[in-house]
Swiss-Prot record:
This is Triosephosphate isomerase. InterPro entries: Aldolase_TIM, TIM_sf, TrioseP_Isoase_bac/euk, Triosephosphate_isomerase, Triosephosphate_isomerase_AS. Keywords: Cytoplasm, Gluconeogenesis, Glycolysis, Isomerase. It comes from Geobacter metallireducens (strain ATCC 53774 / DSM 7210 / GS-15). Belongs to the triosephosphate isomerase family. One of its GO terms (molecular function) is triose-phosphate isomerase activity. One of its GO terms (biological process) is glycerol catabolic process.
Length: 251
């Protein structure tokens, strides 16, 4: 049985006071939810403050990125070990915005994933196709390449620390959402590829999240699909009531 994960990616939003106010609002909404793993990913500068705010509740902390070296002359970077020290249990790696704006490649994603696993973090590994790639009927080709390259060199045991997040780039922040059926087809393909690269048993246990304009209004239909194990939520994770409603999609 794969435990669902609802993860909120705050992107470049919420200073310290805003983050703490959000957590204070969210906790009462989700504190009785025991059958869903809840993760929030604030900006680096508020990680420690948010960790203190969620210390006694069922919410876990993620960063939005990391570097592949643990320390050194790498100005502006944050290492996986530093994220653990700040209280993180998870880290998002390979988000489409990192790929689009900051030169992230499959190679750098792979290096970051290996470093994060070594530090003990659970990785939310993002993959997904652009609109042009989908219209050129290259969705499966793109997903397979991203999975093969991103997970290259990982041992089977490492997959216990991997959660895959499928984010069709054309549906991020656009208000467009893949239909439940489109999302399920992509998720089933991702699970198939993981089975081919590792084992069918690993593929059956790995959790695959959907990310692409997830809202309270569409989360239940997505979560009813057999290969969708959760959501990586963007805009709707910035308001406690909407994120709480997504977390409590079973209610």
């Amino acid at each position: 049985m794969r435990t669902p994960i609802i993860a909120g990616n705050w992107k470049l939003f919420k200073k310290s006071s805003e983050a703490q106010d959000f957590v204070a609002e969210l906790i009462p909404l989700v504190q009785k939810t025991t059958d869903v793993e809840i993760v929030i990913a604030p900006v680096f500068t508020v990680l420690s403050a948010v960790k203190r705010a969620i210390a006694d509740c069922n919410i876990m902390l993620s960063a939005q990125d990391c570097f592949w070296e643990e320390e050194g002359a790498f100005t502006g970077e944050i290492s996986p070990g530093m994220l653990v020290d700040a209280g993180c249990s998870h880290v998002i790696i390979g988000h489409s915005e990192r790929r689009q704006y900051f030169g992230e490649t499959d190679e750098t994603v792979n290096r970051k994933i290996k470093a994060a696993i070594t530090a003990g973090l659970t990785v939310l590994f993002c993959i997904g196709e652009t609109l042009a790639e989908r219209e050129a009927d290259k969705t499966f080709e793109v997903l397979r390449t991203q999975i093969e390259n991103g997970l290259a060199g990982l041992a089977r045991g490492d997959l216990a620390k991997i959660v895959i997040a499928y984010e069709p780039v054309w549906a991020i922040g656009t208000g467009k959402t893949a239909t439940d059926e489109q999302a399920q087809i992509a998720h089933a393909f991702i699970r198939k590829v993981v089975g081919e690269l590792f084992t069918v048993q690993i593929a059956e246990t790995i959790r695959i999240l959907y990310g692409g304009s997830v809202k309270p209004e569409n989360v239940r239909g997505l979560m009813n699909q057999p290969d969708i194990d959760g959501a990586l939520v963007g805009g709707a994770s910035l308001k406690a009531d909407s994120f709480g409603a997504i977390v409590n999609y079973k209610a």
